Structure formats: C-alpha cells, structure tokens
Amino acid sequence: MLKLAGREWFVQHTPGHTADHICLHDPETGAFMSGDHVLPSITPHIGGVSYLSDPLKSFFYSLDRVGEIRDVDLALPAHGHPFNDLKGRAQSIKEHHFERLDEIRNIANDLGRADVNAFMKRLFRERSWGDMAESETYAHLEHLRLEGKAEAHRNEEGRLVYDL
C-alpha cells in the first residue's frame, strides 16, 4: 500500500519490462498506473540481461496477474493515451510474444544454428532498434532454451549460438 496524493494505491510488482517494475492501482477510482508494463499501442521492451532467470516468463506471469485485477476502469500508461481494456490489452501483448516465439522457431528452420544477431536481423527487418532489439531477441531465445525448446552453445569465436 502506498499513500499518494491523499489516496491509497495498491502496489503490484510486475517484473518483465524491468526486474523492478511496479504498477499502482486505486480500486476506489478504478485508476491503474500501468507504467511501461502495459502500453496501449506498442509492446514494452523485454530486456534479456537481468537478474531474473527468464524475463519473458516473468513478464507473462505479471501480465496474467494484472489481467486478474478487478475494478480497473482506466489504465494510465507511461507512453501513449489512457485506455480502458487492461485485461484485453495484457492478453494481446502476450499473444504478440507468443507469435514472436513462433516466428523465431520459423526463422530457426531457415537459419539453422545462429547467433542472437542473426535472429534479430530477421525479427526486426522493418526497423532497426539496435541494442533493444538484440536484447529482446536474446530474451526470447533464452526463454525457449529455459523451456527446453532450444539449446545454446559457444561457437569458435565465442559467440552464443542457438539450435532450435
């Protein structure tokens, strides 16, 4: 519980975008400060380097928890306009990442064993996001590895390569 502007807000730890991300909920007014956790028109960046063993899995869990919160009438994101359907948007973001995981599996069929950068170039063809794209690609590949759906090895140059 956090007192803010004379109101009591429930603090919801929502790791994924960052390991220490929180959201705030005021059930009396129905306001939910979603920060960078749930955004209305883009998906939050999921970084692969974190003290969390699987940031993407943590993000999925956090999205599920947020989707279960009752009495949310208005979500207030850190980027974009306020929106109403928090549960629906959280589910939509999860579906986006499930599609991204499928896309990685399809890319692996074409590439074979490849490093993070090779996967990133195929995932983010339409726009270069640099380090953010590479770390998010890494988060997805590591998620697959930790789920037992990929293997990671070091190549001759010492680069981490993935087999799916």
Residue ranges and their predicted role:
Residues 1-9:
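Alpha-helix-centered segments that form part of catalytic cores
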Residues 3, 23-25, 163:
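Short, well-ordered beta-strand micro-motif
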Residues 5, 27, 155-157:
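Structural motif
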Residues 6, 70, 108-112:
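Short coil/turn residues that cap or connect secondary-structure elements
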Residues 8-103:
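Metallo-beta-lactamase
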Residues 103-164:
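C-terminal regulatory/interaction regions
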